[in-house]
Amino acid sequence: MISVMSSAASFRTEKDLLGVLEVPAQAYYGIQTLRAVNNFRLSGVPISHYPKLVVGLAMVKQAAADANRELGQLSERKHAAISEACARLIRGDFHEEFVVDMIQGGAGTSTNMNANEVIANIALEAMGHQKGEYQYLHPNNDVNMAQSTNDAYPTAIRLGLLLGHDALLASLDSLIQAFAAKGAEFSHVLKMGRTQLQDAVPMTLGQEFRAFATTLGEDLARLKTLAPELLTEVNLGGTAIGTGINADPRYQALAVQRLATISGQPLVPAADLIEATSDMGAFVLFSGMLKRTAVKLSKICNDLRLLSSGPRTGINEINLPARQPGSSIMPGKVNPVIPEAVNQVAFQVIGNDLALTMAAEGGQLQLNVMEPLIAFKIFDSIRLLQRAMDMLREHCIVGITANEARCRELVEHSIGLVTALNPYIGYENATRIARIALESGRGVLELVREEGLLDDAMLDDILRPENMIAPRLVPLKA
């Protein structure tokens, strides 16, 4: 590739095997990136949308340069310039130069070349040259030395996921703590549990919210161990298909060791580079775990919407914080917009997992060319989940209040209360009371009192929350 500045100085002319193109003079990307931008106008989501992926790419290029310098393949001056460029990308500079669409043909070559060209042009300026003067430092020959897209790109994806993993875990943990706090706050609020949307047996609102915390806690524990298990084995050094062609035999170990040091992640070389280059199983499993979390979040949000329904004609056991007016035609209406939004995020994550699964299955022979879609969907799922969990916690969970009187009223009027009374009044009496209550619309307690089956003191003892919400063996009445 050769660059020539145009007379207007607003563009520079770069050349590749397909011909010449005018690249914006101020752009740090080059001709191959520009071709990709022109070819792939698809999702509208550029690589820069995911900063951890950009940082992962820069770290891979830094590690490769370090290894090549140690092996005597890269000059000290070029190594210093590439190192400065990578350091700036890792700090967050120049991310706007990563302009290629996340969805692209070529198995990620456009992303890799976007990184190579940006690093090369930053390095050229550090050396005192102009952008595009690749005769002094070349995107392919120098920045991409001993690499293929097929090992640099998947390694950067794995590293980007690892670098962002703690933030995802922190958001999930904070949400769990918020649910647990509400569980403690509502521990005294007796309410009816429901199965199949029908009254079942009493429980506390605190138990309901603690269960939300527990189920998400299971996912937190799995995610903490899953990412290190799945993503720390990298195929850097395998080059095109895993054979390591065009790389020094010592390069793989050096490059991976340097990458582990640079990133602070416990990266190790893949045991089978052919398998590691062609198989996408780690991404499938990790995405499946994200989907599981999304499914749980959506179910929880369904419950929150049901429990707050009404407020006058629904369940109305809890109040969700009012976030915005709910209708352009119905005055005073307020909708559960935060749980609704989380539901939609969950649907997107579930869809992302399906798309990723199909892309993983779509690989052929020694390479999966669908890896750009895999990267896009998994980074998108993480971004959406993290934002949704933060939103749910900040704008909904911490502000939930209980309608204690309503909860108690529903318990006292529920036919399901006869299950708790059954050991004291006997099955025949309990069945008869339930039938009369259903037919007449009267309350169970009212009928029990009327027939003198239990006195008020006994009823008060039976209806104490601690006696209704945990195992308690009572000899059945004969």
From Swiss-Prot:
SUPFAM superfamilies: L-aspartase-like. Gene3D superfamilies: Fumarase/aspartase (C-terminal domain), Fumarase/aspartase (Central domain), Fumarase/aspartase (N-terminal domain). GO terms for biological process: aspartate metabolic process; tricarboxylic acid cycle. Its EC number is 4.3.1.1. It catalyses: L-aspartate = fumarate + NH4(+). GO terms for molecular function: aspartate ammonia-lyase activity. Keywords: Lyase. It holds the Pfam family Lyase_1. Residues 326-335 are annotated as: SS loop. One of its GO terms (cellular component) is cytosol. The active site is at 327 (proton acceptor). It is an enzyme of class 4 (lyase). L-aspartate binds at residues 109, 148-150, 195, 328, 333. InterPro entries: ApsA, Aspartate_Ammonia-Lyase, Fumarase/histidase_N, Fumarase_C_C, Fumarate_lyase_CS, Fumarate_lyase_fam, Fumarate_lyase_N, L-Aspartase-like. PANTHER family: ASPARTATE AMMONIA-LYASE (PTHR42696:SF2). Homotetramer. Catalyzes the reversible conversion of L-aspartate to fumarate and ammonia. Belongs to the class-II fumarase/aspartase family. Aspartase subfamily. This is Aspartate ammonia-lyase. It comes from Pseudomonas fluorescens. The gene is aspA.
